[in-house]
């Protein structure tokens, strides 16, 4: 390719590779998967030799809680057996691309190079090896994409291709973090523009996807990574902060290339109607379609956390919150494409927020996560019920390295074994992947529901009360009458007869029963 500007001529060699065979038909992640979220720099240090490099500003310093610790791609590769044995079938690592900020670069969300892996994580070639090795174990890879903003150290910041390549102001102008302005019929134009054009943070210039060449750049960038690295999905950071029309066009281009691909967007808001607005296929009042197949289920995340952080005795508290959240399912275009979770890298660890840090409450949360509709995601370390005792609300403190070997306590191993059995079982149950849901009004801090299809059903009864509860089996006849009421607890092998009226579930525990015809 020859580039000319005035009397200057520059030639660049550009390789056009053959597309992977069958690439268009690639299958993305879906509700049969369990996603394992990794904070890349903090997870596992598999190659200490790359912790600091001459070309990157911030060096590794494990004594600095806000600094880099050395986690890397090799650490993920070394942990594939741990992840597979847990029952996870997909991995979402936080951004692995270059982030050359002088401080806080460990999080990776201030990109300095969209086409190269940060050398402290590895290389493009090693990333491809990770994908290949993961695929050999039946594990998909989801790439964390950040088109909303770049980093202040990105090379183009020294010489912007266009003045409007980024959204610029006379003085630093922060977004107000209230993206409801995008669908609020009463919103001012001032608030709407500030939502989309304000910077997420000082070292994160806001990209202007209304510039058609930038939009094309990001479309080609995303498609290139799919083809080059053979990835299985994308997670889009801060999706509603992008101008919504070009954001939809960006996703439309990707989905046109890969109709069966899946992309999940971070739409961090709690009201279900607001989350539903951003899912592709939503019947929106303004006709807008995001082209985003999957959205994160923040309403259910909040409901489960609130249900288990207290004793649930207050009016409308406890598991009633989960029941209420699920009643909003009618709002969504596709509930099987809701990304469900108990926590992530931006919120206090689940084991820290449940009442008394009780592992029994942690298990209740995990059973709900494994059996409710949607695509479950587990934050690394939660398989051990990891906590951040120094400061549970500090992002840096909750993102500590995964315990390895002798660092794993007896209690942590017991929790891992429980979750491994749970998610390995889920992996083999299509009724949990695509079955319908029938639930019953939450009473006395309990919640009973069925996932079912024409041939089988899974019954789940969660008791978050501090005393035993009797299952109101007589209330469930409208669905149990369609199956053999004698079923099996898949985690214990115990036979359970749901026609009986005296089945008690101990305090702070769950019961699962698989029914067939």
Regions found by a protein language model. Give the residues of each.
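Soluble or luminal CAZymes and related metallo-dependent hydrolases
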Residues: 68-75, 122-126, 213-218, 242, ...
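Active-site clefts of carbohydrate-active enzymes
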Residues: 335-355
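Hydrophobic faces of well-ordered beta-strands that scaffold small-molecule active sites
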Residues: 34-36, 91-93, 141-143, 234, ...
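Active-site rim elements
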Residues: 66, 208, 235-238, 350-359, ...
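Carbohydrate-interacting/catalytic domains
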Residues: 1-35, 77, 81-87, 373, ...
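Active-site-proximal helices and loops of the catalytic beta/alpha 8
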Residues: 131-135, 149, 154, 221-223, ...
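Substrate-binding/active-site clefts of carbohydrate-active enzymes
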Residues: 33, 41-229, 247-257, 273-275, ...
């Amino acid at each position: 390719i020859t580039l000319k500007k005035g009397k200057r001529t520059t030639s660049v060699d550009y390789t056009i590779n053959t597309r992977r065979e069958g690439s268009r038909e690639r299958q993305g992640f879906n509700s049969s998967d369990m996603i394992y979220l990794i904070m890349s720099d903090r997870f596992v240090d598999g190659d200490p030799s790359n912790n600091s490099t001459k070309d990157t500003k911030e060096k590794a310093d494990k004594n600095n809680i806000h600094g880099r610790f050395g986690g890397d791609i090799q650490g993920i590769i070394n942990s594939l057996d741990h992840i597979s044995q847990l029952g996870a079938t997909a991995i979402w690592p936080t951004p692995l691309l270059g982030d050359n900020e002088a401080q806080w670069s460990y999080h990776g969300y201030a990109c300095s190079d969209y086409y190269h892996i940060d050398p402290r994580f590895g290389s493009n070639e090693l990333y491809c090896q990770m994908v290949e090795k993961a695929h050999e174990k039946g594990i998909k890879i989801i790439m964390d994409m950040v088109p909303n903003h770049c980093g202040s150290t990105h090379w183009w910041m020294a010489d912007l291709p266009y003045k409007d390549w980024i959204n610029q102001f006379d003085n630093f102008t922060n977004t107000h973090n209230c993206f409801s302005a995008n669908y609020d019929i009463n919103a001012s134009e001032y608030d709407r523009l500030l939502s989309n054009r304000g910077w997420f943070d000082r070292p994160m210039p806001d990209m202007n996807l209304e510039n058609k060449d930038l939009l094309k750049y990001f479309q080609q960038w995303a498609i290139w990574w799919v083809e080059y690295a053979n990835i299985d999905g994308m997670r889009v950071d801060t999706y509603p902060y992008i101008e919504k029309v070009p954001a939809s066009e960006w996703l439309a281009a990707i989905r046109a290339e890969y109709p069966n691909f899946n992309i999940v967007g971070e739409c961090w808001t709690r009201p279900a109607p607001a989350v539903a607005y951003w899912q592709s296929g939503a019947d929106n009042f303004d006709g807008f379609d995001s082209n985003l197949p999957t959205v994160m289920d923040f309403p259910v995340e909040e409901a489960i956390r609130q249900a288990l952080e207290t004793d649930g005795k207050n009016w409308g508290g406890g598991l009633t919150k989960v029941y209420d959240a699920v009643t909003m399912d009618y709002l969504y275009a596709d509930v099987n494409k809701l990304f469900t979770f108990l926590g992530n890298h931006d919120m206090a660890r689940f084991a820290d927020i449940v009442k008394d840090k009780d592992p029994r409450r942690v298990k209740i949360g995990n059973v709900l996560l494994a059996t409710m509709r949607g695509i479950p995601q587990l934050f690394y370390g939660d398989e051990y019920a990891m906590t951040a005792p120094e400061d549970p609300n500090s992002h840096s403190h909750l993102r500590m390295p995964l315990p390895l070997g002798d660092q794993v306590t007896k209690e942590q191993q017991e929790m891992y074994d429980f979750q491994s059995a749970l998610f390995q079982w889920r992996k083999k149950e299509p009724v949990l992947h695509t079955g319908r849901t029938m639930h019953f009004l939450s009473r006395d801090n309990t919640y009973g529901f069925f996932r079912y299809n024409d041939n089988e059903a899974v019954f789940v009864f969660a008791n978050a009360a501090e005393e035993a509860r009797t299952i109101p089996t007589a209330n469930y006849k409208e669905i149990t009458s369609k199956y053999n009421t004698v079923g099996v607890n898949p985690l214990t092998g115990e036979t359970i007869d749901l026609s009986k009226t005296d089945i008690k579930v101990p305090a702070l525990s769950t019961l699962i029963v698989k029914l067939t015809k």
